[in-house]
């Protein structure tokens, strides 16, 4: 298919699938877009193509700054904000010839698991259950996932803090890849939790995700959390060791975390996991059970750390420095509250306000030692658990602590881990809306139980779709389950390689 025809198809799909609410903003003037595509077509015909994405439409989650489109974070408080600059990842992909397809819908500021917490309305999954009711698209990058699943763009970028790229990928039948923390620049990405936020990629297949990843996997001096050239060189040298280099062509040692086999796992997802393991064994890989004992504490630690960072990051949205301004006084009527309390109260959604309060509490003098500090300790234990089971050492800080060595001596060293992405197939949106808001939020938090550990450790992880029979969960088209591949820090290419071998398999 020609690039122009592919672009026209994406634009047509944006119109025909508008009811899914995947996009907040799309290209309004198509003439310049078509000219860009024609130029890319000429470069391709003459052998001067800039990259694999040259002339292709890439969508960006609406918390990634773009100069030519508003950046709202799906929040009323940023409803009128347009960034004066492009995020680094937008610049990198534009330099590679990619064309911005638009800005995708999300949970407000990335806080949510079902794309319900958006001031622009919920994102709807393109798949339907037997009764014709709409399914959750996952969150918070649900708009990016649906836009890819319905061919409204070639690929899309999202952000993954605790699973926000991988969970929507599992629900929509796409590939969602979260790179190692620090490889991809966060400059120009609106912060939720700085130590966890990672720009992720959503695509139809792992090969496309790899193409996009290689473009954005570069040093950016403007982002202090981005890996330096020295650290990148250290990772590259580490991966050139013969024992590690051979993994790209030989059989692998694949670990199965026993703690992920929870009672709440749905029968269809459990079956997909088991059959995926069996398939990899048939391909010549060896399977080894491993233990990640701190897994049971990871989710609780995440929901202390992420809101704590969010409460700090979102303090600037007060109607004075950033954000829309409410000019009416609050209920107290005090002059000093005119541009602050009312603005934040009206501008933020319920879930964002809930997390700001939770974060402020965990950082308070009375709670910081019992909550925030303890959560940081749990995070370190989660990292130690992963270091203990992987054959490759952590290349940035390779010296193992005593606990790592003791754990490692008791179990097999593996190259990657395989586990479910989500404990169940996507729920119905109506059920999520009708449930009491507090209990609905708590249930949504538990959807991250399998994705949060890799986020806390900063590891690369990908969700790939496999086909199974999910009709036991009441869906005529819910035959896709997400299987997650997790690798050691810096093993991004290996994670994508294993993902590519597994994606789209029918069991």
Curated annotation (Swiss-Prot):
SUPFAM superfamilies: Amidase signature (AS) enzymes. It catalyses: L-glutamyl-tRNA(Gln) + L-glutamine + ATP + H2O = L-glutaminyl-tRNA(Gln) + L-glutamate + ADP + phosphate + H(+). GO terms for molecular function: ATP binding; glutaminyl-tRNA synthase (glutamine-hydrolyzing) activity. InterPro entries: Amidase, Amidase_CS, Amidase_dom, AS_sf, GatA. Its main location: mitochondrion. GO terms for cellular component: glutamyl-tRNA(Gln) amidotransferase complex; mitochondrion. It comes from the Eukaryota. It is an enzyme of class 6 (ligase). Its EC number is 6.3.5.7. One of its GO terms (biological process) is mitochondrial translation. It is found in: Mitochondrion. Keywords: ATP-binding, Ligase, Mitochondrion, Nucleotide-binding, Protein biosynthesis. Coiled coil: none annotated. It holds the Pfam family Amidase. The active site is at residues 61, 140, 164. Allows the formation of correctly charged Gln-tRNA(Gln) through the transamidation of misacylated Glu-tRNA(Gln) in the mitochondria. The reaction takes place in the presence of glutamine and ATP through an activated gamma-phospho-Glu-tRNA(Gln). Belongs to the amidase family. GatA subfamily. PANTHER family: GLUTAMYL-TRNA(GLN) AMIDOTRANSFERASE SUBUNIT A, MITOCHONDRIAL, TRANSAMIDASE. Subunit of the heterotrimeric GatCAB amidotransferase (AdT) complex, composed of A, B and C subunits. This is Glutamyl-tRNA(Gln) amidotransferase subunit A, mitochondrial. It comes from Aspergillus fumigatus (strain ATCC MYA-4609 / CBS 101355 / FGSC A1100 / Af293). The lineage of its organism: Eukaryota, Fungi, Dikarya, Ascomycota, Pezizomycotina.
């Amino acid at each position: 298919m020609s690039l122009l025809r592919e672009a026209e198809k994406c634009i047509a799909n944006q119109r025909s699938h508008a009811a899914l609410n995947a996009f907040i903003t799309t290209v309004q003037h198509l003439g310049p877009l078509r000219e860009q595509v024609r130029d890319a077509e000429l470069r391709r015909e003459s052998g001067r193509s800039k990259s694999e994405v040259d002339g292709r439409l890439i969508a960006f989650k609406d918390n990634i700054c773009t100069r030519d489109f508003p950046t709202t974070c799906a929040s009323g408080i940023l409803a009128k904000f347009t960034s004066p600059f492009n995020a680094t990842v937008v610049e990198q992909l534009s330099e590679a010839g990619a064309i911005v397809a638009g800005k995708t819908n999300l949970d407000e500021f990335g806080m949510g698991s079902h794309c319900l917490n958006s001031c622009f309305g919920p994102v709807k999954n393109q798949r339907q259950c037997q009764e014709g009711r709409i399914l959750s698209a996952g969150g918070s990058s649900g708009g990016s996932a649906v836009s890819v699943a319905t061919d409204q763009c070639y690929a899309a970028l999202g952000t993954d803090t605790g699973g926000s790229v991988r969970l929507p990928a599992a629900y929509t039948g796409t590939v969602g890849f979260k790179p190692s923390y620090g490889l991809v620049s966060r400059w120009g990405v609106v912060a939720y939790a700085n130590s966890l936020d990672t720009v992720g990629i959503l695509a139809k297949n792992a090969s496309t995700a790899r193409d996009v990843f290689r473009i954005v996997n570069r040093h950016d001096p403007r982002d202090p959390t981005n890996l330096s050239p020295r650290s990148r060189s250290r990772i590259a040298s580490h991966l050139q060791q013969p024992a590690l280099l051979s993994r790209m062509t030989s059989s692998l040692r694949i670990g199965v975390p026993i703690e992920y086999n929870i009672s709440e796992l749905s029968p269809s997802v459990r079956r997909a996991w088991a059959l995926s393991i069996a398939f990899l064994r048939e391909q010549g890989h060896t399977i080894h059970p491993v233990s990640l004992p701190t897994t049971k504490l990871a989710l609780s630690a995440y929901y202390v750390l992420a809101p704590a960072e969010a409460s700090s990051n979102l303090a600037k949205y007060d109607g004075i420095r950033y954000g829309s301004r409410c000019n009416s006084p609050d209920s107290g009527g005090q002059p000093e509250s005119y541009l602050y309390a009312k603005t934040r109260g009206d501008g933020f959604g319920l879930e964002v306000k809930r997390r700001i309060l939770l974060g402020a509490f965990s950082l308070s003098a009375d709670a910081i030692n019992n909550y925030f500090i303890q959560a940081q300790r749990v995070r370190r234990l989660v990292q130690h658990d992963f270091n203990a089971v992987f054959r490759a050492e952590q290349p940035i800080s390779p010296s193992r602590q005593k606990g790592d060595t003791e754990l490692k001596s008791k179990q097999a060293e593996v190259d990657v881990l395989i586990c479910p992405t989500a404990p169940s197939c996507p729920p119905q949106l109506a059920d999520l809306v009708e449930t009491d808001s507090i209990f609905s939020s708590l249930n949504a938090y538990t959807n991250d139980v399998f994705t949060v550990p890799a986020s806390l450790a900063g590891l690369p992880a990908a969700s790939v779709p496999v086909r199974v029979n999910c009709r036991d969960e009441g869906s005529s088209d819910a035959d896709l389950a997400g299987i997650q591949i997790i690798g050691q820090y810096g093993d991004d290419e290996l994670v994508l390689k294993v993902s590519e071998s597994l994606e789209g398999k029918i069991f």
